[in-house]
UniProtKB/Swiss-Prot annotation:
InterPro entries: ATPase_NBD, Carb_kinase_FGGY, FGGY_C, FGGY_N, Ribulokinase. It catalyses: D-ribulose + ATP = D-ribulose 5-phosphate + ADP + H(+); L-ribulose + ATP = L-ribulose 5-phosphate + ADP + H(+). The lineage of its organism: Bacteria, Bacillati, Bacillota, Bacilli, Bacillales. This is Ribulokinase. The keyword Kinase applies. The gene is araB. Belongs to the ribulokinase family. One of its GO terms (biological process) is L-arabinose catabolic process to xylulose 5-phosphate. The keyword ATP-binding applies. GO terms for molecular function: ATP binding; D-ribulokinase activity; ribulokinase activity. It comes from Staphylococcus aureus (strain Mu3 / ATCC 700698). Keywords: Arabinose catabolism, ATP-binding, Carbohydrate metabolism, Kinase, Nucleotide-binding, Transferase.
Amino acid sequence: MSYSIGIDYGTASGRVFLINTTNGQVVSKFVKPYTHGVIESELNGLKIPHTYALQNSNDYLEIMEEGISYIVRESKIDPVNIVGIGIDFTSSTIIFTDENLNPVHNLKQFKNNPHAYVKLWKHHGAYKEAEKLYQTAIENNNKWLGHYGYNVSSEWMIPKIMEVMNRAPEIMEKTAYIMEAGDWIVNKLTNKNVRSNCGLGFKAFWEEETGFHYDLFDKIDPKLSKVIQDKVSAPVVNIGEVVGKLDDKMAQKLGLSKETMVSPFIIDAHASLLGIGSEKDKEMTMVMGTSTCHLMLNEKQHQVPGISGSVKGAIIPELFAYEAGQSAVGDLFEYVAKQAPKSYVDEAANRNMTVFELMNEKIKHQMPGESGLIALDWHNGNRSVLSDSNLTGCIFGLTLQTKHEDIYRAYLEATAFGTKMIMQQYQDWHMEVEKVFACGGIPKKNAVMMDIYANVLNKKLIVMDSEYAPAIGAAILGAVSGGAHNSINDAVDAMKEPILYEINPEAEKVQRYETLFKAYKALHDIHGYKKANIMKDIQSLRVEG
């Protein structure tokens, strides 16, 4: 019997899973928050801009080393039987290293320089660079722009590199390699310097046929092309292929066999499709956590405005993978819960329940529209379909009678409406949606929210029995790399997670939500582009520390 390891690096924590490659059974798991968390307001006591979201890469090694040691010890599995390791990671999460793959933030002189640290996916400090990249692409009619939804996000790799070039050239001077954090973990495991086609294709303006778009980079700054060529470009390994064996020293350190194979890293949300078994077209999968990614597969490459990218073979070989998303979902609900009145917090504590459970109890019998509220869920910008990280959230319909649970429900509904905008965009561009899957901790824990989604989308909603689909998906790739299965599809069939429950839409609720959605779309269009300057002008008054 063989086993594989899936290491899942999320926004706030990391997970290491040991999986039976025959039946997908979770043999052992390790979950730990990052020691330094997300660095957002201060770095070593120094204030940093509110658009920044950084991390300390030492936390990633801590997860890997402690996690693998734990699952091997706890499971009592002979390491010889662990055939492969797969990695998934939030993206685009960028790391800057020296020639030995050591992160430059560990250098003493850069300890307090935020640009030396890992730039987490939700770091929006490169918004000016993203705008410049977009405008240059538009002016020069770059054909690839349609593959990225006709937009450029500050969350992607190239704008973040430009940000460091512009604002911290001393960091760039000391940097030998720039890569996705997922690639960094793979390279640390194998002592190689490779890149995954998934990370490059979705986040770095790279295509298998043409490579990087140096013609565009040259028009922005010839130095940018040189940085990409010297520090980013490396041999590319496709999803489903093998990077190589564990480095001997790393195998000894982790207590694993040096024959253990390592797969290329896959973006965390994309790994979820493998983990739940969504491997066909006409299926939209919502990977719900801090944010939500909306993923689809298709045999053709369509140029869908407002999506985050389309890459061939980034999840399943020969199929184009499509990604869209919402930047604040779990984060938004957590924000609302933290604003709950003390009486709600006390009631929840007295009844031995969470604030979320209390608010769900209060709203579960409300009909759509009963509160009179509607909201825009842009507290961390809008990724799809407006592709504008500078947009901000709004709520409409407040009265002196509005209760906190009404606000909570309005935000649940807002995220569902945002998902419907994305689903309709896919459908408008020749990608039919017949099934909708939901996976992650939120769907499993929040049936009230899933009921709202089913009725807003007017689709049967299939909720998967897994909080950890990305880790399962990563382990599936590890199993393939280790030879336990001949193909990704075979591994998915054997190891995928089961269905927890299904929800069918209800006609009356669907009709009421259609009315609310029209109002949402009107507000979306007004504040998203027709008069987006209203909230942006207010935001411009904020003073950076």
